[in-house]
Every structure is written in C-alpha cells, then in structure tokens.
Amino acid sequence: MKNELEKVMAGRDMTENEMNMLANSIIQGELSDVQIASFLVALKMKGESASELTGLARALQKAAISIPTNLTNAMDNCGTGGDRSFSFNISTTAAFVLAAGGVNMAKHGNRSITSKSGSADVLEALGINLYLPAEKLAQVFDKVGLVFLFAQNLHPAMKYFTPVRRQLEIPTIMNLTGPLINPIPLDTQLLGTSRPDLLELTANVLKGLGRKRALVITGEGGMDEATPFGLNHYALLENGEVTLHKFRAADVGMSEVALNDIRGGEAPENSEILKNVLENCSSAFLETTVLNAGLGFYANGKVDSIKSGIELAREVIAQGAALEKLHELQAEQIG
C-alpha cells in the first residue's frame, strides 16, 4: 500500500495490474478505513487513469455475485452520481421506458451517497425488493426484460468502501467504477458522468471491458445525465472507435426546461414523479426522461439518431408500455 500511495501522490499512474492487486487487498480486508480513504483522496487529487479504472473494475467485477440469466444483449444506464443537482431519478425512470421499448435493461444502482434519493431508494419506495437472491433476479430479468440489481447486495466487496465514501462525502474513483461493474455482462451501455474531462477515457475503458457500443454523457453544469437545457457533451463508442460530440435540446427537436423544474426530493416524492412520467403527465420531468431514454435507445443501437430515440421514447410512454413495465417489475421483483 505504501509504495502505491507514494506513486499516486507523486502524480504517477498505477498500472492495471498494480490497481488490481491493491483492490484485491482491500477486498480481502487487509487495509484500514484510513488507508482506503487516503488512497481514494490521493487518486482524486492526481486524476484517475484508464488503467486504474480498468484494474479496479476488473477486481470488483470478479468479486461480484454472478446472475445466471439466459438473456443476452443486456444494457445498463447507470450513472456515476455525485453531481449534487438534486434532480429526480432520471436514469431509473428512463430504464422503464427503455425496457418497454425492447431493450434488456439490467439496471444497476445503489442507495444515495450525495443526493436525497438513489435508484435503490426510489425503487424500494415503489415496492421493489432489493434483496432477492441471484437466481431469482435472473428469473425476473428473463421474464420481464428488466431487473434492478442492488449493488450493496451483489458486491460484497463494497462493504470495505461504503463507510469511507459516506464519511468523505465527495465523488471518488468509486463513483466512476460503479457503473462499470454490473453483475450481468453488458453488450451496450449509457453511462452518465459528472466529469466531462473523463468522457473519452471512460468510453475507452468501456471498450476495454468488452462493450460493443456505448455512450458516455455529461450534461450542462456537470450533471451525470443528458439535460434539456444548456450544452451536453458525449463520447460515443461505435465500431471500436470513440468519437466526441455535443448537442443542445434544440438540436434534437426539444424545447429547453430549467434545472429547478427537474429537481426531486426524498424517495417517496421521487417515486410519485416516476409514476407521473410513466403515466405521460406533461412536465419537465417527462421531457428530461424522454431525452435520456432517447439517448439510451441510440446508445443501444435501436435507432440511428438521438432524435429518433426521443420519438420512440414518447411513443412507448404514450402507449402505456412503460407504465406496464413498472407494473410487471412490481409483480415479479417481490417477496
């Protein structure tokens, strides 16, 4: 640990193997909270590298509980969190739209770290069981084409990181790693990050981890979602190549809304917002959801443009299919 910490503090990147070995030491309970915290802060101050992200992701992925699903072509739209926008649960709401549109959604998430309501919090408020065993989760996914995978339940190794992260109260490499370690192997991914400086790097990490197609997005003001206001930047992984792009709401046929109009609250309030969106109630919440679901359809390769993805998202919601997908999950991910 000392050598690795000194290396990072000197501004030098760890190799993938060095990070993998250090992560395994943490996972095996060999380091104290103070050592883990000092390491996370040092990495943040230096700036995380692709090799460090990949090494940590591979170690945590290997330690995760496997989900024995029969479905292929799985996708996730989990974000890094940590943007402190206090928005409603955008990616969680969009996941129902994506699943209703035919995308096999393995929604990976956690409780709130820096916001009022994480994806796990809002889904628990909707009656979703966070603690089903892996075999049952696989059955839910195979039947519904959507499942919520509670990170704390499926990543036993996280118990060594979570107390430290809560005490630090700042985004760390763990925020960046969380979306990379879905227990179900992913073919495609929409990943929101609050770090626009890491768009290209993260897309290349996803490439190294085997994603066939992926889109990494940062919204206006560093939101880890696409925003229907201001400028969005994204990196697209397509055909093995990473390209950088940007767009505004008007570029994809949408009107702008204000950040204040998409702020959420605690889990009960956010669960009502989610249901209202899936019921097609006109609002800034709905507009933000169709934008992010549209981006997800594009990331998945189901449509050939973001604008076409937005149109598909509106259609899925208007037909009631997204609300029905919520009801399906509520009926299956229980007990």
From Swiss-Prot:
Q: How is the cofactor bound?
A: Binds 2 magnesium ions per monomer.
Which NCBIfam families does the entry link to? trpD (TIGR01245)
- Name used for this protein in its record: Anthranilate phosphoribosyltransferase
Hey, which family's this protein in? Belongs to the anthranilate phosphoribosyltransferase family.
- For the ligand (5-phospho-alpha-D-ribose 1-diphosphate), the binding residues are 79, 82-83, 87, 89-92, 107-115, 119
Can you list the GO cellular component terms from the UniProt entry?
cytosol
Q: Is Transmembrane set as a keyword in this record?
A: no
Protein task: Catalyzes the transfer of the phosphoribosyl group of 5-phosphorylribose-1-pyrophosphate (PRPP) to anthranilate to yield N-(5'-phosphoribosyl)-anthranilate (PRA).
Q: Lineage from the top down?
A: Bacteria, Bacillati, Bacillota, Bacilli, Lactobacillales
